[in-house]
């Protein structure tokens, strides 16, 4: 190992990964993913789909998850800066409904590993950001789930100024809270 540093988070399973960066007068080189290094760090997943999105400042995406086809995700920022959040939705977890957030940026080059059964979202802090992520299952459009980003029962402390007008999809504006989600899982 030695090519990555792995920081465990307060919520079991979440990990912040910092790669080794090798720079000189030409620029830099880093491995964004090496199966052997990640396996040695306890992240032994097979990723089957890579995605990339671009967003402008104050875009908030999330909080998303797949219900019947949950995905582990490895997320990073290629350009710009975001505040990235995961919310524990694992049934029976001692930290169910708790959240963890981390700044991911092109400058700090950190990555965030999010296990299955977490809701995930981010807000763009820079003027523009490109966001890339690997998933362990394919996207299933009919299996989308979500929780509203500002659910007071979760209490995410988004680093956005009061009164900031967020840019969100209509779908993300309509998600219910974690209580509604929990109730729907009990009944469904």
Predicted regions and their residues:
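Short beta-strand His + acidic residue motifs that chelate non-heme Fe in jelly-roll/DSBH
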Residues: 112, 120-125, 133
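Non-catalytic, conserved peripheral segments adjacent to functional cores
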Residues: 1-107, 126-128, 135-188
